[in-house]
């Protein structure tokens, strides 16, 4: 079976190519790219697309500020040529979410094979303070996914139980024994 190839076009020679961080990486890193100028901004309160002027830090690095609870369209400068029956899924890098408190505004980006325009990252600042979004920085990661064709069928009765599961949303972490402290789920982090 041939390995599919994800082709990409860079809008300029200064755009950093997506790349796998290690030989075992499931996803490829995606870099931000913007020049001196403006970065698109979506303001929740006005529901209008505006732009914010870029700045330079003391080392000359280009950045733009994203304020608390704001969403910003961060350009990548990349257009993907996605194989038929595939899509690209875009995720925030875990270090960016943990260290910087930045998330993808749509949770997960989905780029369809028939979308042939430049890709943006919808960054959301979940912090109480402003953050700097730097040019040529790895904020997201992408993966090529095989799409499976399926139909949607309405049924007249609610689905019945298929396993021993009892309870609704989030019930797989609920035990019938009394709790002896905070639930740690499967990650080891207290919730």
Where do the model's predicted regions map?
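DUTPase catalytic domain/fold
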Residues: 1-191
């Amino acid at each position: 079976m041939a390995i599919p190839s994800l082709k990409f076009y860079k809008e300029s020679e200064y755009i950093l190519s997506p790349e796998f961080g290690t030989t075992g990486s499931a996803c490829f890193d995606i870099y931000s790219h913007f020049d001196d100028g403006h970065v698109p901004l979506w303001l929740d309160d006005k529901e209008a697309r505006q732009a914010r002027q870029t700045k330079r830090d003391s080392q000359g690095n280009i950045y733009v500020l994203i304020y608390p609870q704001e969403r910003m369209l961060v350009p990548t400068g990349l257009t993907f040529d996605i194989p038929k029956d595939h899509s690209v899924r875009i995720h925030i890098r875990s270090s960016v979410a943990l260290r910087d408190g930045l998330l993808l505004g749509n949770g997960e980006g989905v780029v369809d094979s028939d979308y042939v325009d430049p890709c943006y990252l919808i960054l959301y600042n979940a912090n109480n303070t402003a953050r700097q979004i730097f040019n040529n920085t790895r904020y997201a990661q992408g993966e090529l996914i095989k799409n499976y064709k399926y139909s949607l069928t309405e049924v007249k009765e609610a689905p019945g139980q298929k396993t021993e599961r009892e309870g609704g949303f989030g019930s797989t972490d609920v035990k019938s024994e009394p709790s002896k402290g905070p639930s740690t789920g499967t990650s080891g982090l207290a919730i």
